[in-house]
Curated annotation (Swiss-Prot):
Recorded GO MF terms: heme binding; iron ion binding; sterol 14-demethylase activity
Protein name: Eburicol 14-alpha-demethylase
Matches recorded under PANTHER family: 24-HYDROXYCHOLESTEROL 7-ALPHA-HYDROXYLASE, CYTOCHROME P450 FAMILY 7
Alphabetized Pfam families for the sequence: p450
């Protein structure tokens, strides 16, 4: 009792002196301390032997969120060294199971539809941006039909016209861009490539009318849509936050613009003029039940088409230019490759679709950039049924989210010796610097044509399985054409004697160069 009386007197004195601030602070600190203690004890004393090991963390709910968010790849490799290829971490209160390596990629990316689900993970993020009844806001069977409609338009005949459109857009941009006036200067290359990729994609895939709308105001609307892809919107997509209000206004405005273009096309019957673009393909498409694709859904798919491809192409093209600035010798090799193929007479002849496959070093530069800078570092799926992990004792419960990270595999020394070195020549035939990339590429029709199911390759920049990117061929065409055109015009270099490239910004869902990504340029 004596000790209790002393403590009571001390508490009374402190409360009198500092008031309720001291009391509230003491209680809050005690609660936090208790929560941390119970969280640590639960990890040490109540391990579940039939679930993957949980990454140790001090704070409940927060878990490993901060270390994962700062650098996902470092987090994955550190955890793999300690726990193995499969482990679970706490991400804002959710249990997230990561399964790395070839087996992990196959387990998740080729998981059965009844076992894993992408829609429940991404719909809160994508539906406010794209619009209703498309992509992840519809049954998977309908999504497969939508992908088939768009894939049908990506024909070889269309690709021939796309190369000319893209080259002309890049040349027009270079000639008109304030940042490229004069004979030399510096430029924020990420900003430039974001504009070039959206101009080229909108013109090639969606037609001249759409491209004509991409003035500064329309580009600003797409920027507002882009801001809707912030990670916080996985949970707070509904919140009346400033960027969400701007997102919703932009979505309505852009969708209305597309619907006006669609209506004008129907009235003018401009099918022949626009036969190569995806908008026209959707306008004449019909679902399996006989329902024509509604104009509203076409408009929403047009938004999805640009937004989904824009991040990947913008990021990848920026990394290409940054690496060429860091390695001017490789940029000169690219120029020499074009001299060998097209001759030394200037100006070079216009690029043709058939030329792209001859530009082998250009292709290898793209491959090496995608290997080191996969646009998406974490591919997520919701577990719908308990999943047994083959060859282990583990069963993944339905309360977990799964993550596959093909980008980890492409940075694994097992398959790519000296994996963090940027070396386009590792892809040269016979170099011996790419291992395990000769797996048989199995194909399956998920409802939108034969698609690669193979996840056994260590190099999967476009994913695998039913959600594999349908735009791989177009993205390759677009990026190689942009690269070849830029090489014809410029020499790039790092500024201020810097070595290598800028670090990666992981604060968004896509692995972008950390801003500002400045490089020096000089016209040839």
């Amino acid at each position: 009792m004596y000790i209790a009386d002393i403590l009571s007197d001390l508490l009374t004195q402190q409360t009198t002196r500092y008031g309720w601030i001291f009391m509230v602070t003491s209680i809050a600190f005690s609660i936090i301390l208790l929560a941390v203690g119970l969280n640590v004890l639960s990890q040490l004393l109540f391990r579940r032997p039939y679930e993957p090991p949980v990454v140790f963390h001090w704070f409940p709910i927060i878990g490993s969120t901060i270390s994962y968010g700062i650098d996902p790849y470092k987090f994955y490799f550190d955890c793999r060294a300690k726990y193995g290829d499969i482990f679970t971490f706490i991400l804002l209160g959710k249990k997230v199971t990561v399964y790395l390596g070839l087996q992990g990629n196959n387990f998740i990316l080729n998981g059965k539809l009844k076992d894993v689900n992408a829609e429940e993970i991404y719909t809160n993020l994508t539906t406010p941006v794209f619009g209703r009844d498309v992509v992840y806001d519809c049954p998977n069977s309908k999504l497969m039909e939508q992908k088939k409609f768009m894939k049908t338009a990506l024909t070889i005949e269309a690709f021939h016209s796309y190369v000319t459109i893209i080259q002309n857009e890049v040349e027009a941009y270079i000639n008109n861009c304030v940042s490229f006036q004069g004979e030399s200067g510096t430029v924020n290359i990420s900003k430039v490539m974001a504009e070039i990729t959206i101009y080229t994609a909108s013109h090639a895939l969606q037609g001249e009318e759409v491209r004509e709308n991409f003035d500064s105001s329309f580009a600003a609307l797409y920027h507002d849509l882009d801001m809707g892809f912030t990670p916080i919107n996985f949970t707070f997509y509904w919140a009346p936050l400033p960027w969400n209000r701007a997102r919703d206004h932009a979505q309505r405005t852009v969708a209305r613009t597309y619907m006006n273009i669609i209506q004008a096309r129907r009235e003018e019957k401009r099918s022949g003029e626009n036969k190569h673009d995806i908008m026209w393909e959707l306008m004449r498409s019909t679902y399996k039940d006989g329902t024509p694709v509604p104009d509203r859904e076409i408009a929403h798919m047009m938004i999805a088409l640009l937004m989904a491809g824009q991040h990947s192409s913008s990021s990848t093209s920026s990394w290409i230019m940054l690496w060429l600035a860091a390695r001017p010798d490789i940029m000169e090799e690219l120029y020499e490759e074009q001299l060998r193929i097209f001759g030394s007479e200037k100006p070079f002849p216009p690029l043709q679709y058939e030329d792209l496959s001859k530009l082998q070093l250009h292709q290898n530069v793209l491959k090496e950039v995608l290997r080191l800078h996969a646009p998406i570092h974490s591919i997520m799926r919701k577990v719908k049924n308990p999943m047994i992990v083959p060859g282990t004792k583990y069963v993944i419960p339905t309360s977990h989210v799964l993550i596959s990270s093909p980008g980890c595999t492409s940075q694994d020394a097992t398959f790519f010796p000296d994996p963090l070195k940027w070396d386009p020549h590792r892809w040269d035939i016979g170099s011996g610097k790419v291992l395990g990339n000769d797996a048989v590429d199995e194909k399956y029709d998920y409802g939108y044509g034969l698609t690669s199911t193979g996840a056994s390759s260590p190099y999967l920049p476009f994913g695998a399985g039913r959600h594999r990117c349908i735009g791989e061929q177009f993205a390759t065409l677009q990026l190689v054409t942009i690269m070849a055109t830029m090489v014809r015009f410029f020499r790039f270099r790092n500024i201020d004697g810097k070595q290598g490239v800028v670090k990666t910004d992981y604060s968004s869902l896509f692995s972008m160069p950390l801003a500002p990504a400045l490089i020096g340029w000089e016209k040839r």
